[in-house]
Amino acid sequence: MPKLAGSKTSENLKASFAEAAQASRRYLYFARQADIEGYADAAGMLRDMAEGEANHSLGSLDFLREVGDPATGKPFGMTQQNLLSAFQDESYQGNEMYLEFARAARAEGFDEVAEWFETLARAEKAHAERFRSMSAQLFED
């Protein structure tokens, strides 16, 4: 059987995962707006579609276990691996990515967006700590 790592199929699985995961979240956002506007049937349909897209993303992620977490490249699948990969991704987002996004937004004059990114950085740091703490609780003697 061919190796998935480094293949075009691996890249396509990563793209499929990202697209379906983003669609799921967008559809939930759209459903909230439909609720606000009083369109209960549309909101329900959007939630159903969001669940379907979430399942599509999980199917692609199952194949990617052979390659590594699409966000970190680290092994994932077992809880200890998953917690470590999640910790590393949240740490990166909180300590680097969102702070850089905030700097860029501020440099372009988007102070409100910069503040949002700084809020996200703080949240991601807190998430990283939760992942670290759970990993320590479960897997460190």
Region locations from a protein language model:
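Non-heme di-metal
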Residues: 1-141
